[in-house]
Every structure is written in structure tokens, then in C-alpha cells.
């Protein structure tokens, strides 16, 4: 058995934590009092259940495990408190014996007349020792699917493997059975021939033997080069070994990413045009993206102009569509970041470079381990629960999308070593305490108040003028990705699509270049500014101004909670039309109640009393110890 609590696999702690979370308040506090004596820290952990919806038992054990608590201490404490069910779950676990998966080999040839790839190094060593070599080949369309050998960690449908790697598919009625599994990527044929296979000589010639002058970027697992074939530019991703990678990792990664790329066909997913598994290297071939990555454009690298808001919102909408499409195929990208959102000549986003993860069926395979120094740069886009627990779920992609949305909204890099805090996610999540203390957070939700704080402090000023309520809608979408554990991508995408539709309609009436690009609020366009914080008003106050609104504007499609955005956007459009067609609307005399000044301490007490009546706050937190 593991010596320390932090050495227990995360899936082992899942059941005990759920069991402990279901205890009564008295029993749980009795257990917690033996673990932690600092009441302030205990209250902080307890509040995480209400604010962030996390397991308080897991947070407690994490805190205890970081102080070198042992598994024996945990089991003894559970037995002393007669919590035998949780103790037995831990005692029943035994470390599974380490199983070494055989390294999949590549075919000696993919065409009878031209060899393409060699077997892996391990297979060569076994052959020298006289041991039989098991070759995993890619059968043709006429081969039986059962003969295709797939890696143990990747189990796509059996008919996908043979039909994904060949383009000469039969046109008979028998092919109808494969209509849902045959990737549509096969229509994107490379110029090297009528197949996705590229020979080693073709790749070497196109890249000038991977000349350093052609290198575009260098990543953790691959280097990216630019090359030409028949006058057409291509991008070549050359996989490479890392210092801490295991033997055969390139081959496994190559096969996994190849299978996933060939299953995807979406306008916002970067298509694969070919691949090469040569003796000296493994490479993927992609179309060349003229506008680089979203990260480059946001940071203005190469002297590029700042992206205006309509294009920024359109890129965000395309990214969310791509991730939603992958999740529909049960594929977890797990590498969503602004540097992997590539832009073509029309600034259409293309999500690239997945880490090749299929949604696993086995519960234990949902957890992953990652080397620290490989993981540092990606940590800026990963949620805290994944960093602690290592459980790979779709929420990892959704959280990463929230960080990209925040980068687009604020123009702040996801990671900056010269900034405190270093990660943008920590900067945004630090707004939660002040947001929860706001008097309107109980009515409009923590995400909405948090979004207002983010817009007031960090909204990008150099991309032109963005209406306040559109900015808050985008910030709310980002906050939903960052905070909610069961966020619906459809809900987030609906909000972003509503803003995109409104900006597109406004751009048709007034070109975006005619708006002020130097400030976030233009002095040429009137704004509804009051001396009070408008965030304290709920949606009903927004509807009350509709009777005196000016010319009607087309309402945006309502989908998944977009009603608030539709009313707000109408107010913004009507207020801009007021500058040309008429005087300001009359003020409602019933709205003067905001002038009543309430003592801040009294207001806080009134809020706590309401929470106490709703059983969301106990007496200790209400009156203090």
C-alpha cells in the first residue's frame, strides 16, 4: 500500500470522498476536526463546496496529504470514528502490476512497389535476438477488419482503420455500411499522389531536408517547418523524442493522432493532408495558415494590426464549434490554447495539434500522469482539479476554451513570468471573492458579477469600441467555462454566437473601421451611465426601458439563456439611434429608490441573514465563533 495519501491514485479516492461527502454535518465536522485544527482554513475548505461545487473531503485530504499524512493514519482515523465503509474501500485497493504495452509497429510498405516506413527500434532489436516480431499492418479495403492490429490504448471502430488510410474506396453498395465511419478527410488529397501517404523523399525535398531556415516554431513534442510542393505551401510537423519520453512514444503518438485527425472533418478543425512514417522521422502534413496563430495576432507579433472585435468574436465562435464537434465524437483535445488556434487567409479559426485522447471507457484510464517540466507551459490552460487529480474529462477542454476567450477579451497572455500572478486564470479567478461579496451576486449569479468586474478592469482597449453589454456577455461565457463544473458548450456557444450576430448586423450599418479604436468607450456614441452600479439591477429593470426605446432593431435568436443579452443589446442599439433621431428618454420616477444609502455593514448583515434563512449559511459563519 502507498505510504502517503498523495501517492494514492485519484480514482481510489473517488469513492471514499463521495462516501464522506454524504455524511451528516456533525459526522463530517468530527472527522475534519481530527485532520485540521485551523478554523479559518476549515471554513475556507467548507466554502469551496458552496462557491466552486467541489468535494470538500477531497480538498481536506489534499490539504492533509501535502503535510505528509500517511494512508495508515487515514485508515486508523476512519476506523476510530467507525467510518468502516470508507476505510474498507481504501483497504481493498491493491496496486495493479505494471503492464508494458507492446509498441505498435508500422508497415514495411504501404504500396507493393514503394516501401515507406520501417518497423520500430524495439522490433529491430527483437529480430536481432532471434525473437519473432509482431507487425501491426494497415490492411487494404478488401482485408478483414479483424486482422487490423490496434494499440491497446486506442480502440476506434475496427472499420475505421483500414478505410481511413486509403482513398481508393469501393463505390459499390457495400460501402454504405461504412458511411458513418469513413472519414471525409480522404477527399483532401495531397499533391504527392492519389493518397495521403507521402514518401520520405517527397518530404525531404519539400522541406529542404528540414532546413532550419524553414522552421516556423518549436514545441515540446514536435518542430514545425514550412515547405513547398509543386508551388503550394505546406506545413510539416516533425515529431521528436523528449528527454523524459518513454521508448516508442513517437510511434504511439503518431498512430493515435493519425487516427483522430482522419476521423475529423469540420471547417474549424485543421485538416491533415498527408503523413509520412519514415525511417528517420515521423511527420504530418497540414495546409499552410497564412495568418499564423491566434496568440501571435493577439500579441501583435510581426507588426500585425490588432484584431477588431467582430473578428475576435467570430474566432471564439469557431473555436467553440470545433471543441463541441470533437466532444460529439467522444474525442478530448486536451491541448486547447491560443497558439493552437490557427488562422487562414480569411481569419477562419482552425483548431490544431490534439494530444490524441479518446474518451476512455475504463474508469481507471481517465487519469493521466504528466512530467512536470513538460506540463508547465500547458498549466496556464488547465483547471486546478485536473492538476491535482489528473482526471482527463471534457471539462479540461471547456476550461481551456474559457482561458482562450479571456485572452481574446482582455488581450492578456495566458502566462507571463514577469506578471504576478503568472497565470491569467489565477488573475481572473481572484475576482471571485469580491464578486461573491457583491449585493447583486445572489440575484444575477456569481459569473455575471465576476464578468462585470473583469470588463471594468481588464477589457482590451486597442481593438476598437465594444458595447458594454456585449463585453459582459463574452466575459460571462468565459466565466462559465472557468467556474461551472458541468458547463454546457452549447450554452456558451449560444451567448458568443448572439454577440457575433449583433456585431455583424451593426458592422453592416456602420463599418467597424469607423469606430474609435483607441478607447473602450467612444465619446461619439452615447452611453447609459448612472451614478449607481447598474449591476445591482436585475433583468426586469432592463425590460422596463423598452417602452420608450427608439427604432426597433432585429432581435437576436434566443437560445439557452440568451434572453438577457437580447434585451441588453436592444438597449444599446436604441441608445445609439437616440443620438440622431430624438431626445433622451424620460426618467422613470420609480427608479429614484437607489438614492437610499445603506450602511455597508448593515447591508452585509442583511445578505447573510437571507442566506441563513435559505440554509446556505450556518450560524457560526453568520455571527462568528
UniProtKB/Swiss-Prot annotation:
Binding sites annotated in the UniProt record for ATP: 216-224, 237, 337-340
Residues of the Protein kinase domain: 210-503
Transmembrane spans: none
The keyword Transport is assigned to this record: no
UniProt keyword rRNA processing present: no
MF terms (GO), sorted A to Z: ATP binding; protein kinase activity
Keyword terms: ATP-binding, Nucleotide-binding, Phosphoprotein
UniProt remark on domains: The protein kinase domain is predicted to be catalytically inactive.
Function: Binds to the IL-1 type I receptor following IL-1 engagement, triggering intracellular signaling cascades leading to transcriptional up-regulation and mRNA stabilization.
PANTHER family according to UniProt: INTERLEUKIN-1 RECEPTOR-ASSOCIATED KINASE (PTHR24419), INTERLEUKIN-1 RECEPTOR-ASSOCIATED KINASE-LIKE 2 (PTHR24419:SF2)
Family of the protein in this entry: Belongs to the protein kinase superfamily. TKL Ser/Thr protein kinase family. Pelle subfamily.
Name of the protein this chain belongs to: Interleukin-1 receptor-associated kinase-like 2
Gene: IRAK2
Amino acid at each position: 500500500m502507498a505510504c502517503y495519501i498523495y501517492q494514492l491514485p485519484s480514482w481510489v479516492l473517488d469513492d471514499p470522498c463521495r462516501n464522506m461527502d454524504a455524511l451528516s454535518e456533525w459526522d463530517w465536522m468530527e472527522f475534519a476536526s481530527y485532520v485540521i485544527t485551523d478554523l479559518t482554513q476549515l471554513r475556507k475548505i467548507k466554502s469551496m463546496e458552496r462557491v466552486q461545487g467541489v468535494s470538500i473531503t477531497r480538498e481536506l485530504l489534499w490539504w492533509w496529504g501535502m503535510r505528509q499524512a500517511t494512508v495508515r493514519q487515514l485508515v486508523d482515523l476512519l476506523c476510530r470514528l467507525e467510518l468502516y465503509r470508507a476505510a474498507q474501500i481504501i483497504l481493498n485497493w491493491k496496486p495493479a502490476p505494471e503492464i508494458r504495452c507492446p509498441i505498435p509497429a508500422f508497415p514495411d510498405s504501404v504500396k507493393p512497389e514503394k516501401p515507406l516506413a520501417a518497423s520500430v527500434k524495439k522490433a529491430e532489436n527483437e529480430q536481432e535476438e532471434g525473437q519473432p516480431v509482431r507487425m501491426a499492418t494497415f490492411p487494404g479495403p478488401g482485408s478483414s477488419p479483424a486482422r487490423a492490429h490496434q494499440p491497446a490504448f486506442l480502440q476506434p471502430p475496427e472499420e475505421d482503420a483500414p478505410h481511413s488510410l486509403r482513398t481508393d474506396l469501393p463505390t459499390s453498395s457495400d460501402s454504405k455500411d461504412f458511411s458513418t465511419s469513413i472519414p471525409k478527410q480522404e477527399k483532401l488529397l495531397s499533391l504527392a499522389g492519389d493518397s495521403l501517404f507521402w514518401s520520405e523523399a517527397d518530404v525531404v525535398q519539400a522541406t529542404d531536408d528540414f532546413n532550419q531556415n524553414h522552421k516556423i516554431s518549436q514545441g515540446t513534442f514536435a518542430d514545425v517547418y514550412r515547405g513547398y510542393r509543386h508551388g503550394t505551401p505546406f506545413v510539416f510537423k516533425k515529431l521528436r523524442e523528449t528527454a523524459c519520453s518513454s521508448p516508442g512514444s513517437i510511434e504511439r503518438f503518431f498512430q493515435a493522432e493519425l487516427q483522430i485527425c482522419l476521423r475529423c472533418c469540420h471547417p474549424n478543425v485543421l485538416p491533415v493532408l498527408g503523413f509520412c512514417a519514415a525511417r528517420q522521422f515521423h511527420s504530418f502534413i497540414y495546409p499552410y495558415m497564412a495568418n499564423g496563430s491566434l496568440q501571435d495576432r493577439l500579441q501583435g507579433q510581426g507588426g500585425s494590426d490588432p484584431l477588431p472585435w467582430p473578428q475576435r468574436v467570430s474566432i471564439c465562435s469557431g473555436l467553440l464549434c470545433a471543441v463541441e464537434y470533437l466532444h460529439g465524437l467522444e474525442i478530448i483535445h486536451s491541448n486547447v490554447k491560443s497558439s493552437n488556434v490557427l488562422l487562414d487567409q480569411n481569419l477562419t479559426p482552425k483548431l490544431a495539434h490534439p494530444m490524441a485522447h479518446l474518451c476512455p471507457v475504463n474508469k481507471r484510464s481517465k487519469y493521466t500522469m504528466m512530467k512536470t517540466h513538460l506540463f508547465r507551459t500547458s498549466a496556464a490552460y488547465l483547471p486546478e482539479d485536473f492538476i491535482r487529480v489528473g482526471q482527463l474529462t471534457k471539462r479540461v477542454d471547456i476550461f481551456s476554451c474559457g482561458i482562450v476567450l479571456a485572452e481574446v477579451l482582455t488581450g492578456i497572455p495566458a502566462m507571463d513570468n514577469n506578471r504576478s500572478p503568472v497565470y491569467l486564470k489565477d488573475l481572473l479567478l481572484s475576482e471571485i471573492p469580491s464578486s461573491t461579496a457583491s449585493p447583486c451576486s445572489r440575484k444575477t449569479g456569481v459569473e455575471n458579477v465576476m464578468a462585470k468586474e473583469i470588463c471594468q478592469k481588464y477589457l482590451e482597449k486597442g481593438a476598437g469600441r465594444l458595447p458594454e453589454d456585449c463585453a459582459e456577455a463574452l466575459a460571462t461565457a468565459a466565466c462559465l467555462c472557468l467556474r461551472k463544473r458541468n458547463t454546457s458548450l452549447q450554452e456558451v456557444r449560444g451567448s458568443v454566437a448572439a454577440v457575433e450576430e449583433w456585431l455583424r448586423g451593426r458592422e453592416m450599418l456602420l463599418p467597424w473601421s469607423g469606430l474609435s479604436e483607441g478607447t473602450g468607450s467612444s465619446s461619439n456614441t452615447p452611453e447609459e451611465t448612472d451614478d449607481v452600479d447598474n449591476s445591482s439591477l436585475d433583468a426586469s429593470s432592463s425590460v422596463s426601458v423598452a417602452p420608450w426605446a427608439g427604432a426597433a432593431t432585429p432581435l437576436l435568436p434566443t437560445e439557452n439563456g440568451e434572453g438577457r443579452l437580447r434585451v441588453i443589446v436592444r438597449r444599446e442599439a436604441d441608445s445609439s439611434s437616440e443620438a440622431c433621431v430624438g431626445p433622451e428618454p424620460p426618467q422613470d420616477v420609480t427608479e429614484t429608490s437607489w438614492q437610499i444609502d445603506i450602511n455597508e455593514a448593515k447591508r452585509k448583515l442583511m445578505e447573510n441573514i437571507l442566506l441563513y434563512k435559505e440554509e446556505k449559511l450556518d450560524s457560526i459563519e453568520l455571527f462568528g465563533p
